[in-house]
């Protein structure tokens, strides 16, 4: 039976995560090679002094193929767990390279806030919600 490749984002599973390897298992459920590459990147970026200019050295150090490394890096970047800083970014004083990012955390906080406000009956109105429901319904009709 083939394993799914989509992120396994279940509330019960989230409460059971105790370390970054389990987090990466949730983010890369169907590809052990990408999970390993992501774990290597995460560990290297976490314990690096400053930014890592290039992640290509991980290919030789950990025996990871370039394609797997690039795909894992792209997914971690899209999720906001890592980010590339340009040398033109004045915030980092001309430094450039890869670093761990807080965008994922900020996005999850915003999502939690949106879920909380959408449940609150004091925010918005029933008429507006029914109108929005009508828009969703209209998008279903061909």
What is the predicted function of each stretch?
Residues 1, 137-142:
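C-terminal regulatory/oligomerization modules of transcriptional regulators
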Residues 32-35, 87-113:
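Short, cationic-aromatic polyanion-contact patches
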Residues 73:
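DNA major-groove recognition helix of helix-turn-helix
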Residues 77-89:
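A short, conserved structural fragment
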Residues 67-70:
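Key DNA-contact positions within bacterial/archaeal DNA-binding proteins
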Residues 102-134:
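Short, amphipathic alpha-helical interaction segments positioned at domain boundaries
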Residues 51-65, 76:
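A short alpha-helical element within helix-turn-helix/winged-helix DNA-binding domains
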Residues 1-53:
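Short recognition helix of helix-turn-helix/winged-helix DNA-binding domains
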